[in-house]
């Protein structure tokens, strides 16, 4: 098969088909863990924003374009890029992360980060 045909075929593949939901899940899980281990509320919130951004993707519930999206080059977010049967568990973990972002108490925010991490870890 000549090179031009291969390039044309790959150009027609939708971006979602090239998405790496597993990589997005791993990154979200890592950032939830970083949040759980943070020494201050700003650190917890920052890493939980990264977790949410990786899970929901741009335009998703809680996506914050002002915060880093460590999964920007991996796809459209773990939730939209995952199989339908995994989405409820991913949504539940994203909600824990959003709850942690909303918490103003360090202990509560860290608890929510730990819960999000544990939920995501089970999906790996």
Language model feature labels by segment:
Residues 9-18:
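N-terminal signal peptide c-region/cleavage motif recognized by signal peptidases
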Residues 1, 17-20:
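Absolute protein N-terminus
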Residues 2-9:
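Sec-dependent signal peptide recognition
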Residues 19-124:
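Mature extracytoplasmic or organellar-lumen-exposed domains after removal of signal/transit peptides
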């Amino acid at each position: 098969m000549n090179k031009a045909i291969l390039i044309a075929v790959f150009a027609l593949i939708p971006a979602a088909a090239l998405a790496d939901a597993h990589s997005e899940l791993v990154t979200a899980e890592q950032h939830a863990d970083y949040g759980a281990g943070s020494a201050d509320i700003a650190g917890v919130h920052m890493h939980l924003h990264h977790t949410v951004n990786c899970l929901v993707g741009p335009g998703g519930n809680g996506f914050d374009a002002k915060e880093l999206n460590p999964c920007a080059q991996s796809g459209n977010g773990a939730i939209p890029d995952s199989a339908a049967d995994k989405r409820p568990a991913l949504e539940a973990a994203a909600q824990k992360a959003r709850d942690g972002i909303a918490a103003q108490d360090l202990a509560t925010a860290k608890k929510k980060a730990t819960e999000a991490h544990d939920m995501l870890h089970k999906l790996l």
